[in-house]
Every structure is written in C-alpha cells, then in structure tokens.
Amino acid sequence: MRGVNRVMLIGNLGRDPDVQFLEGNIGVAKFPLATTETFKDRGGKLISQTEWHTVVLWRGLAELAQKYLHKGSLVYIEGRLRTRSWEDKEGNKKFATEVVGDNLIMLDKRADGPAHPASHSTSQGDSVEGFHNQEI
C-alpha cells in the first residue's frame, strides 16, 4: 500500500515571505503560517489554539508569494510535509519539518471589490535537487 502525504491549511502569514533566488534563478519563498482552531472546553468557554507552520513555495509560487502575499494575508495552502536535515556551523545536526506547497489560493478580499480567490498551483512543488537540504 502506498502512503499519503498531503497537507491542507487555511491561515494567516506571520510575516512577509522571505524570497531568495538560487542558482539558475530558481525562486524559493519561506514564511510562517498561523492556523487557529476554536473549540469549547468542558465548561463551555471558547478556547483558541494557534499552531505555526513553516511553508516553503518554489519557482512560480515563490514569485507569486513575493508579489502578492504579506504579513496577515489569508491563504489556503496545499502541499506535502517534508523534513530536512543539515549540520550547523558547530557540526550539530538540525532538523526542520516544513509544508512544501504546490497549491496556493489567496483568500483575502481585494481592496477594490469582492473577494478574489486567486488560485495558483504548480507541478514543480518539489525542492530542487541539491538545494533541499540547505538551510534556506
């Protein structure tokens, strides 16, 4: 049986995307995304719980993020979990689990009119060979 590695998130950017262009002018954007769940505890009190996710977008999606996304933007991200490892300057092994997005829908309302759920996806959501284990 094959495994399934699929993540779907709706949340707000915690800061403006950090966009870098790697060798070959390949864009990569990285940003924190907050998702908040609200539920009632046993006493009926509303509780909000926020989780932070690191999102990575490649190529065209990175360029869209750079152009249109900013701190507070509401987005739908679909992608895969990816855990990468590297050694820091002191030789310590570090790990990071990230959501590598391959589908992005901007859910913010436009300032000049109705909501504009602009959808963008890529079949190239994977990291680029040679770059996936670097600290970006």
Question: Predicted segment positions?
Answer:
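Conserved positions in beta-strands of structured domains
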Residues: G14, Q20, W58, R82, ...
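Beta-rich strand-turn-strand
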Residues: V55-K94
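OB-fold/S1-family single-stranded nucleic acid-binding modules
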Residues: K89-M106
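Core FKBP-type peptidyl-prolyl cis-trans isomerase
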Residues: L9-Q49, S85, F95
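OB-fold and OB-like beta-barrel modules that bind single-stranded nucleic acids
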Residues: G11-L13, L33, K71-R82, G101-L104
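Acidic, gly/ser/pro-rich intrinsically disordered tails
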Residues: M1-G3, F21-G24, G44-K45, N92, ...
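Short amphipathic alpha-helical segments
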Residues: E51-H53
